Amino acid sequence: FLAGGFHLVRNPAAGLGLLGTGAWLYLAVAFSEELLFRGYLFQRLEKALGRWRTQWLVALLFAAVHWGNPGMTGSTRILASLSIAMAGLLLGLCYLRTRSLALPIGLHLGWNWAQGTLLGFGVSGIPNGGWWTPVFHGQPEWLTGGAFGLEASLPCALVGAVACLALARGLGGGNPANRIMGNSIK
């Protein structure tokens, strides 16, 4: 796309029903994962470990849960784990900013739906027949994410890191990078 790694072709077989079905599917995924990770687990661990240690632990567990997904091997595992952990940090920051699961659920739903149902990429290794279909141009997987999905790309990990830094601003004073790295644990 931006680096010439792929272009999108409209999928003529995809009707409007696909967009609604995908939304319901990814709502179920987002709701269940956020209820487990940011709802139950995060809130229980935060009392014992503090918010930043909990933030890192839950983000790493969130990434590890995806290790059994199709295509999660070799170099894909490294970049996908990094991006999924960044997503876990971002979703945790959304929870910390609002103290509500609505924003993490909405962001999680929106990302998965846009990536899979709308753009046709794999979502965490699960193939999708989307409204559009990505056609890859032989660029390396670390650039495009390949069949695994955008989470297996370096650009996704970098965007996740920038989003985390932006959202961490205002959560407890000091440098946002220090807060994310746990240097000012509260």
Regions found by a protein language model. Give the residues of each.
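Juxtamembrane helix-entry segments on the extracytoplasmic side of multipass membrane proteins
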Residues: 10-23, 73-83, 150, 154
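Hydrophobic alpha-helical transmembrane segments
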Residues: 19-20, 52-57, 81-82, 102-106, ...
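Functionally important transmembrane alpha-helices
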Residues: 76-142
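Membrane-interface helix termini and inter-helical loops of multi-pass transporters
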Residues: 4-13, 71-73, 139-145
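Membrane-interface helix/loop boundary segments of multi-pass membrane proteins
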Residues: 32-57, 70, 74, 93-101
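C-terminal membrane module of polytopic membrane proteins
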Residues: 113-186
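Juxtamembrane helix-loop-helix connectors linking adjacent transmembrane helices
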Residues: 1-35, 42-50, 179, 183-186
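Small-polar-interrupted transmembrane alpha-helices in polytopic inner-membrane proteins
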Residues: 26, 30, 51-67, 84-88
